């Protein structure tokens, strides 16, 4: 006998299962309809509860009493009356801080300085930096302006 094995020695087969058959029972009838019966009973009880609360609240309002707090949900009653907000609140008038925008063009308050016209023979303006015009991307040198890395 090998004491290290976890299976029992009686009825061992080659696949490690014992010779007895285990039947797993499934409570299918309960899961098929029993749970739905409980759910339907709970939903019916909630509907009945809300209906009774609505009847009680309607009777209380007919007698002039206040309804049960947080239960004024009966659908056949009219919604509460809405009161209009007072026009001037805190005795102040509201002023629009910005004037309305118009669609007409308005020139800036001061004219910008005039720029001298380009020469008529040249199509393009002169370069902003003369050094940039002297070199191009094709003449890029390896360490121009860059630190040597590694």
Curated annotation (Swiss-Prot):
It comes from Schizosaccharomyces pombe (strain 972 / ATCC 24843). InterPro entries: Chitin_synth_reg_RCR (IPR020999). PANTHER family: PROTEIN RCR1-RELATED. One of its GO terms (molecular function) is protein-membrane adaptor activity. Residues 1-21, 85-131 are annotated as: Disordered. This is Uncharacterized protein C19C7.05. Residues 106-115 have a biased composition (Pro residues). GO terms for biological process: endocytosis; vesicle-mediated transport. GO terms for cellular component: Golgi apparatus; intracellular membrane-bounded organelle; plasma membrane. It comes from the Eukaryota. Residues 1-19 have a biased composition (Low complexity).
């Amino acid at each position: 006998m090998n004491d290290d094995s976890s299976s029992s020695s009686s009825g061992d087969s080659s696949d490690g299962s014992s010779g007895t058959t285990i039947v797993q029972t499934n409570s299918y009838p309960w899961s098929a309809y029993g749970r739905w019966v409980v759910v339907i009973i709970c939903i019916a009880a909630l509907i009945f509860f809300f209906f009774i609360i609505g009847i009680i609240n309607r009777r209380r309002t007919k007698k002039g009493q206040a309804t049960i707090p947080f239960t004024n949900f009966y659908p056949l009653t009219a919604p509460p009356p809405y009161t209009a907000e007072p026009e001037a609140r805190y005795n102040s008038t509201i002023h629009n801080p910005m004037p309305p925008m118009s669609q007409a063009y308005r020139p800036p308050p001061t004219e910008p300085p005039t720029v001298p016209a380009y020469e008529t023979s040249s199509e393009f303006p002169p370069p902003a930096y003369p050094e940039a015009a002297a070199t191009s991307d094709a003449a890029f040198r390896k360490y121009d302006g860059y630190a040597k890395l590694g």
